[in-house]
Amino acid sequence: MIVDAHLHCSGAEREDDVLRSLDDARVDVGVLLAPFLSEGFSLDDPASLRRANEHVARLVRGRSDRLAGFAVVDPRDREAPLHLRHAIETLGLVGAKMVPTGWYPYDADVQPVFAEARRLGIPLLFHSGIFIDGRSGRFCRPTFFEALRDHPGLKVCLAHLGWPWVDEAIAVGLIDRILGVPAEDCMFRFDISFGPPPPYRREALGRALEVLGPDLLQFGSDCFLPCSGAEIAERMGWVHALLDELEVDADARKRIWGGTAAAWLGRDGAAPARGTSTSSPSGFDRPADDAADEPSRPLRLRDVCC
């Protein structure tokens, strides 16, 4: 099974188009994040985030086999715990995305929403590391997320391997490993969506694999919907090339492509039936223009990232 655990909604996508893109990329399950970066939505406007959550709820309704909807909340909002509960219990979303902009994960006033997430038993995805749109990344250093350990049982994923603080991110994830906590019970896992620019990618992923292992790493394209399946597939090709360079074995690849995210989402790991694609995920072909042998090839980065 292949899970894309990091897909941004814009508010302009339709369910059929999303599923077609996933089919074309041979992705079995997509984690759809409520829009917060596109026109009409803002992390600083709780009312717009409620509309965003309603939008993604409509997209995923009736397609829980293929789509997992994540709410977006601003934990500084005193009503955020209530909005989160409504998104999960009423709208049917299954997780939440948060972006530390103007708040630190250890701030006292954001702890109630983390406590509510723990009560709801949902996975959380956080932006970690630098931004590429000019915002300050000072709120998003991986060690700041250690405060979440005050809420044992949370299931947390830090995006982008915390780049440029990859070593910090690995250290945060390593604590449970040192203490002998089984992978499925570890608080932190990390998505390998492309925060690191090309010169850093192999080193960042290689270190994470060597220290944390594949059970704590999961694929996320960080694509912005609506997009073509070819765009998602291209980013998958980048990961395939890295895994080939690092000589990662088949079992570890299965965990990175889907097993780790399936456990994080509370799924059984069985691949649902796709609509149009009949090819096996293990038979993935890189896009023709994916220069697997050119590690210096620049990524086509957007001017927004989280």
Segments and roles (model prediction):
Residues 1-112, 116-120, 191, 237, ...:
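Mid-domain alpha/beta scaffold segments of enzyme catalytic cores
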Residues 15-16, 43-45, 82-84, 110, ...:
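Short aromatic-enriched loop/helix-cap "lid" or pocket-rim segments at secondary-structure transitions
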